[in-house]
């Protein structure tokens, strides 16, 4: 037989996907651990996580963690992680670490009665799964706060509708009721945000999204068309043009009121 080594990472990834499809089980059931990190969570939520000795540990994501938050494990199914209680009104998923840290520093989780979850860019499976569970089991709305570029749009799409690579388990990972909060193309104009020119790769990605089934709503078509018309993209950090507290004092309260009817304060 010789050595059973994989020639590349893609070989093992494809095998894991095939196993999931053939068996109807998740890769976590096979103890296959991804290299990707899970999210960080801050907020008044309490979980119970089973430790290596098989004992349940109670963890409050506000009182029992430091500023970096609770690290989401690779397996967040009920046999490893229990959702115990919460005293929040919604979960906000945040793309960048800098913005997550800013919201934590400003105490936005307590002021807005929300949980904050750092996506670390394209979210890991465990990140999407725990958001799905909190939405279904606790009835918490999921709102997504990202940069304004085609790649960030795809981050939202992977949360709300699922990713191509994990299409076979979208029912476990996707949260169709998730709401895209911003930054969107309208904000570049409305808030006169510092912006960068779209690259040829950005433009190609936006044109591809116009035929992507996940972006066929009129709202998404309008956003994509406006970005192409402006020829610009913007980062979350562009909101710092108006000071470090602008995002928590003005921008997010305005967007939450507009899109979800949530009034802060």
What are these regions (language model features)?
Residues 1-141, 150-265:
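Nucleic-acid enzyme cleavage-core boundary/entry regions
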Residues 147:
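Glycine-rich phosphate-binding loop
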């Amino acid at each position: 037989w010789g050595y059973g080594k994989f020639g590349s990472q893609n070989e093992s990834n494809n095998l894991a996907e095939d196993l999931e499809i053939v068996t109807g089980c998740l890769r976590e059931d096979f103890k296959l651990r991804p290299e990707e990190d899970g999210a960080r969570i801050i907020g008044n939520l309490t979980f119970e996580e089973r430790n290596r000795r098989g004992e349940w540990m109670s963890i409050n994501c506000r009182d029992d963690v430091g500023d970096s938050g609770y690290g989401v494990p690779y397996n967040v199914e009920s046999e490893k992680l229990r959702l115990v209680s919460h005293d929040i009104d919604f979960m906000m998923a945040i793309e960048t670490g800098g913005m997550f840290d800013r919201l934590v520093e400003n105490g936005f989780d307590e002021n807005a009665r929300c949980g904050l979850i750092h996506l670390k860019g394209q979210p890991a499976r465990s990140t999407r799964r725990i958001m799905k569970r909190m939405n279904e089991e606790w009835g918490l709305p999921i709102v997504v706060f990202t940069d304004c570029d085609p790649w960030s749009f795809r981050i939202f799409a992977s949360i709300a509708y699922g990713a191509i690579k994990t299409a076979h388990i979208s029912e476990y990972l996707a949260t169709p009721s998730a709401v895209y909060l911003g930054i969107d193309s309208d904000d570049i104009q409305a808030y006169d945000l510092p912006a960068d020119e779209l690259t040829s790769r950005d433009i190609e990605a936006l044109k591809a999204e116009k035929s992507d089934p996940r972006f066929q709503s009129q709202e998404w078509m309008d956003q994509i068309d406006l970005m192409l018309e402006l020829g610009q993209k913007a980062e979350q950090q562009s909101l710092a043009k108006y000071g470090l507290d602008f995002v928590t004092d003005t921008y997010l309260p305005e967007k939450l009121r507009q899109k979800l009817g949530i009034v802060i304060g």
